[in-house]
Amino acid sequence: MTLKKLNLHLVSDSSGETVISVAKSALKHFRSIETVEYVWSFVKEEEQIDKILEEINKKSNEHNFVICTITNDKLRKYLKDNCVKLKIPYRAILSHIMREISSYLEIEKDEKFDLHTEINNEYFQRIEAINYTINHDDGQNIQDIDKSDIILIGVSRTSKSPTSMYLAYRGYKVANIPFVGEIPFYFDLAKLKDKLTIGLTIDVNRLVEIRKNRLTSINNEDNSIYADPKKVEKEIKKAEELFKQNNWPIIDVTQKSIEEVSATIIQYFNRM
């Protein structure tokens, strides 16, 4: 089955809990869609919307869809008008419901209501996932890794931590474990048997470039081994061998954004 790719832009003036939940429910009805979700939270100004539209425009040759839960009429109209101008499909979730209630009861909505106060079970689950992921970053606290939903393994600078945090915000408990080529893998792989374990890999030249930039940023250019092309190539090769030996899905992050990598991981998770 050929999957159609959809960039789904979820725009909210609060944390984004509502729009994420609605989008998640809707997407369950489409198995043939490969979705990359971009969550734009706490959008309060037109300038923020301009930046969102600028990012969407960069992918104008792809399928983009905007869903919003902005309650401010003026701001919501600004987003809608610009989406129409750019021919981007747009749907507001809450406005239609609020308008119908307002019309039926002949009352105006409370402009002072703040969606930041909306707290539900999903919110607390997300907080729990974020706390778990923070405490299981970079191989920490592996004694209770069995409580994770997803495990990421990869060499240094393959976006393990930011990907983990993005997934945590979506409600997944994620642990990430570093792979160091010169050191034997220290973890009992039997513990990963029933868990979704993903191997992250990357192009050698790209990783060398990233590591060199990292060394420059911390004023440690003298550490030539960390970014040595031959060493990096060997490290990636060993990591990929481990992934294949254990039949773990491998994702090449070279030309992918955090959102795209996360979308692929979520697809693997949903197949389990």
From Swiss-Prot:
Keywords: Kinase, Nucleotide-binding, Serine/threonine-protein kinase, Transferase. ADP binds at residues 154-161. It comes from the Bacteria. GO terms for molecular function: ADP binding; ATP binding; phosphotransferase activity, phosphate group as acceptor; protein serine/threonine kinase activity; ubiquitin-like modifier activating enzyme activity. The keyword Cell membrane does not apply. Its EC number is 2.7.11.32, 2.7.4.27. It catalyses: N(tele)-phospho-L-histidyl/L-threonyl-[pyruvate, phosphate dikinase] + ADP = N(tele)-phospho-L-histidyl/O-phospho-L-threonyl-[pyruvate, phosphate dikinase] + AMP + H(+); N(tele)-phospho-L-histidyl/O-phospho-L-threonyl-[pyruvate, phosphate dikinase] + phosphate + H(+) = N(tele)-phospho-L-histidyl/L-threonyl-[pyruvate, phosphate dikinase] + diphosphate. InterPro entries: Kinase-pyrophosphorylase (IPR005177), PPDK_reg (IPR026565), Ubiquitin-activating_enz (IPR035985). Bifunctional serine/threonine kinase and phosphorylase involved in the regulation of the pyruvate, phosphate dikinase (PPDK) by catalyzing its phosphorylation/dephosphorylation. Belongs to the pyruvate, phosphate/water dikinase regulatory protein family. PDRP subfamily. HAMAP family: PDRP. This is Putative pyruvate, phosphate dikinase regulatory protein. It comes from Wolbachia sp. subsp. Brugia malayi (strain TRS).
